[in-house]
Amino acid sequence: MTEQISYVNGIKLCSMFNSNLNSFCLSLYFRAGSIFENLSNNGISHLLEHILLRNLKNRFDNFYDLLAMHGIDLQGVTYKEFIRLTINGPYDKFDIATDILCCLFNEFCINVNEFNNEKKRIKAEIRENDERTSLDYYFNKLVWENTEAEKTVLGYCKVLDSISINKLNDFRKECLSKDNCIIYITGNVSPEDINRLKEKINMLDIQENQCKRINTVSVSNEFFHRKCVINVKNGYWNYIKIGFDINGSKYPNAVLDLLYSILFKGNKALIYNYLSEDNSIIYSYDSALEQYDNIGNMNFKFEVDKNRIDDAIMLVIKLLNDIKEGRFNFEANLKAEMYYTKMEIDRPDDLNWSLAYYNHILKTQQIDYTDDFYGRFNITKEQVIEAAKEIFQLKNMTIAIKGNKKKINIKNIEDVLKTLDIYY
């Protein structure tokens, strides 16, 4: 299986076919998001995602029924650095999906009431996520302060109120411009299907790109020079979030992915085994590897009993030091990652995201299904250990705790954290 790439009307068109499947995935990716925004329009990318989907509803009669009648699923998501709009469906409904996709490039045909209703839905999303008081919001500010990544994806209610339909339509043209869009097709699609899509794309009115957007963020003075301050936010339940700064240009991305997998993926994950399976301190956790072309942050969050905060942090430091010492099953984790990559061939949606992200959005090693190591996983245990030693240091660490400030022993936690650098 090989990736096919062509350019049509300024749009990069990528595909990887699998005729053995019963479905396809058709996605539009374009560079937008909070790292390309400023304080006066923060949240405009997320609003654009909503309005693009709302606009489709007005372009087709009984749009949601139309999707259901043809077994088509339509989704949108906004990240800090790009937007993805995805259509999944049965292989014989591809032409209908391409009609829908091409309508995303059309002018808005919504009225003021519909526009304001979508803003209200986003405001409800902001409230539902309790973003301003959340530990995630607090942590994000700590890690990305004074950089483009500090801004929230959802934006702010007052900023949303200031965005007009005309302003958003101008932003749409800027985003859906030549050399800023990728259309990716995976699953059971034929070359003839692709040719018909190319004809439709050629008919679209797409403006020239005025400013090339790159997937990098500024490096603040604090990045790689953390003071290991214990940041505490008042709250009833106790949550801990820990993250580490990463120099993205220093390591092969497969090393970072494997390190992330060792820590967080599946029942073999060290976080799961150390803190949940073996010691019953936590039930579950959330984790993320936030990456840009130059820097990134690997982080995780969990809830813990107020009487086990010190124990939890002690175990986290122990497992990080164990990785530095090579006390993990490299072979099992590497095999798992390679099998995950192989099995994505049978999941058009997951494959679509991975190929678009690793091969075209993030500047890193590309996935290559013609290679025994999929273009990425010809790495050694020593590389992973060396990366762990360099990344898991106090100078790269941000820690934030949400709980009762009066009952959290900062001194004890500081003493525990100091043992993180003992092996470096």
Regions of interest found by a model, annotated:
Residues 1-63, 169-274, 313, 396-424:
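His/Glu-rich zincin catalytic helix
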Residues 60-213, 246-247, 277-424:
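Charge-rich, well-structured scaffold segments of protease-associated domains
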